[in-house]
Structure formats: C-alpha cells, structure tokens
A protein has these predicted regions:
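Accessory, non-ATPase domains that flank or precede helicase/AAA+ motor cores in DNA-metabolism machines
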Residues: 1-312, 326-330, 335
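Cys/His-rich short segments
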Residues: 316-321, 327-400
Length: 400
C-alpha cells in the first residue's frame, strides 16, 4: 500500500495537498479520481511513498485516510509541464491545484483515460531564447511560415498560441499554405470526437508538427516543441477574469524555460512591459520593430468652403458625410463620428493669402473662442490668450 499526496484540480478547495492511500503504483504527474466533500473529482499526484514510511503519521492522524477511486492517466502531464505550472503558481500567489484547473482544459481532464501520452525526455538546462516581432499582420505571419519551415528542417515542432477561437480560425487561413498537412488545431469549440482523434494523431505523428491553439492546450503530448509563439501578445484574453487570475503568457514563458524552447511574442503593438524587456536586452528582435501603426484605411479631406458658398444655411456636416451616414443606417452598420473641434473654430486663416493665425509664443494654430459677447484667441497648447480683433500678420488683410 502507498500514500499519495494529491492536489485537487478544482476551484474552491484551498488546501495545497491532500493525502490518500492506494494499492496501485502511481507516479507523480498522474491524474486520479478521488472523493472530496461528497463528490469525486480529478486530482494530480505530486508525490508517492510507501505506507511503511508513514506509520507514525497514520497512527497519530485525527482522521482516516480515504482511498483513491481510480487512475485516469499515468503520464498526462509531463514533468516540464508540472515544473512550469509550479513556477507560475508561485508567481500568481496561487495554489498549484487552482492554477492547473485554470490552464488545463476541461475536455482534457474529462477524457484523459482515452488520450494518448508521450514520455518526456530528461529535463534540459534552462536557457530562455526570447524574441519579439512587432510588425503588421502580413509581415508577422510571413515570418511565422518561414520559422515553421526552419524548425521542421531541424526536426522541431512549433506551437502558435492565440487568445481566442476567432483568432485561431483567422490564423489557420493565413498559415495553411505548405504546412497544412502537419498542422493541428485545438480550441474550445472542438467536438469531443474530433478532439480525441486530433490529440491521439498528434501524439503518434513521427514528423514535426505545427500546433495552433489557445494557451490551455500547451499540455499536448509533444516534447519536441522548439518554438512557442505567443501571437496577439497584448490581448487581455490571455489573463483569466477569475481567481487565480492566471496569465497564460507567463505560463508559456515558464514552459519554454523548462523545455528549452524559444519563445516569440508577436503583435502589431506589444505590451509596454514587453517593449521594456526588449530595450533592456532581455528579449531580442527577429526584425527591427515597427514603432508606427500602419493602416489601410482610406482618408478623404473635404473642402467645406465650397459647400458654404452654395448653401444659404450653415450645416457642419458635408453632403458626402451625410451620404455615408445614410448608407450606414440603411445597411445597419456601425459608424463612429469623432469630432476634435474646440471653440468656435479650431483654425482661423486669412481669406486673402491663406496664412493660418498662430500662437505668438509656440506657433501652434490658435483657436477662436467666444464668451459674453467677447471673441478671443486661445492657444490649447501653451495657454496664451489674446484679443481676436487683429489683422493678418502676412498681408495685413482683415478678412480672417
């Protein structure tokens, strides 16, 4: 008989470890079913020892030890995965059990007995090779395709971690060219039958694979992962909204440390803390990061002076904008109007020579305001205020 120390994989149970006895030879990392508070739950075995070594503990115990119900899986979670989970639990000031409950998908725990496992190799020396990739989407995914082919040539697999299912579907379309044969998709909407089939096929595939999934599926049975890519790194979805508030980006980094894999953080705009780490030389760059956001949106400048000349009544909205609003309402589309106007007029210019009236202190365009029958110019940059009764500084014209 043996005594096993287990961690319940369930919320609401704060004890770090519970002890049970068993007649089976169960090793650390196994998933077993145990009775807790009148219900049977999954639990993770963290240690196992012969009962003879715990005679005094058993004799002096104020309660009787319960027996484990059954073994779900002997090697479902690998030693590197467990070590990463322990480090992440310490970082989040949470128990290992509650953290595992948040990072291991429910579908994995419920179907653990029918899932194939793979023995993890001996732990590699810890060496984190981190990098950032801050560019537009097209360039990032082009780099990902090249990286996957490079890793395949080295006999290594790649895990592309994404925050949501919609992101996974989009990435699948962008990356399917040339590597679809060895690609495996895992997300929360996968049906049970398809999930078990994909999981077991992944475990048996001798060729390196490309895995696209949410962060919870880092527990897949592949121990040849050479690169972990955290795409859309700035997404808030990576962090859980309930206790223990797990940040999957941190767990992915800890897992990369335990397995010796490279980790890449990619996004159009990375988080401030990630950019800081890059500037402190903690992370390297794959390509020089783009510091400007490129947009494909079409810009159009409309001259309202022609509209005002042709219409007797003043209208702040141009006919072109009115048509866009009308079409959006007819198609039930969303439309955002952003108006940056402050004062009576954000810009005042000379009708004769076109010179813009500027602040005399900082040379920024000055804004016309009105208060109690008084008109004045106010600079919104430096705060200078002056009377609006003036002439053009360029041509001395009075038509401002």
């Amino acid at each position: 008989m043996k005594i096993v120390d287990i961690i319940p994989i369930s919320r609401g149970i704060n004890k770090n470890t519970l002890s049970y006895f068993t007649i089976h030879d169960i090793s650390a990392g196994a998933i077993v079913k145990v009775p807790v508070r009148g219900r049977t739950i999954n639990a993770l075995v963290v240690s196992s020892r012969p009962a003879e070594e715990s005679r005094l503990e058993l004799k002096n115990s104020a309660f009787s030890f319960k027996k484990t119900s059954s073994i779900v899986s002997q090697d479902l979670l690998s030693a590197p995965y467990m070590a990463a989970a322990k480090r992440s639990a310490d970082f989040h000031a949470a128990s290992l059990g509650s953290l595992l409950f948040s990072i291991v998908p429910k579908i994995v725990l419920e179907n653990a007995k029918g899932l194939a496992t793979a023995k993890a190799p001996e732990r590699k020396p810890e060496s984190l090779h981190g990098a950032i990739l801050q560019t537009d989407d097209d360039e990032r995914f082009s780099n990902y395709r090249s990286l996957v082919r490079e890793e395949f040539a080295k006999g290594k697999s790649v895990f592309l971690c994404l925050p949501t299912t919609s992101d996974i579907r989009r990435a699948e379309k962008l990356l399917e060219k040339g590597i679809a044969e060895y690609s495996y998709i895992f997300h929360g909407l996968t049906k049970k039958k398809d999930f078990i089939s994909s999981w077991n096929a992944l475990a048996r595939e001798p060729h390196p694979v490309f895995i696209i999934g949410i962060g919870q599926f880092l527990c897949v049975p592949r121990h040849d992962i050479g690169t972990i890519i955290v795409e859309r790194e700035s997404s808030r979805t990576y962090k859980s909204q309930t206790r223990p508030y797990t940040d999957l980006r941190h767990f992915a980094e800890m897992y990369a440390k335990e397995t010796g894999a490279k980790i890449i953080f990619g996004d159009t705009l990375l988080r401030t803390e990630t950019v800081w780490r890059y500037r402190e030389d903690e992370l390297r760059e794959i390509v020089p990061p783009s510091l400007r956001v490129q947009t494909s949106a079409e810009s159009q400048v409309i001259d309202m002076r022609k509209t005002r000349e042709s219409e007797a009544k003043f209208d702040p909205i141009s006919p072109a904008l009115a048509e866009i609003i009308k079409n959006s309402r007819e198609r039930s589309e969303r439309l955002v109007l952003f108006a940056s106007r402050r004062g009576l007029s954000p810009v005042t210019l000379c009708a004769d020579c076109g010179t813009i009236v500027a602040c005399k202190r900082c040379r920024a365009p000055i804004v016309l305001h009105s208060k109690a029958n008084e008109r004045f110019f106010l600079c919104h940059r430096c705060g200078e205020k002056r009377d609006a009764n003036e002439k053009c500084v360029s041509c001395t014209g009075w038509r401002l």
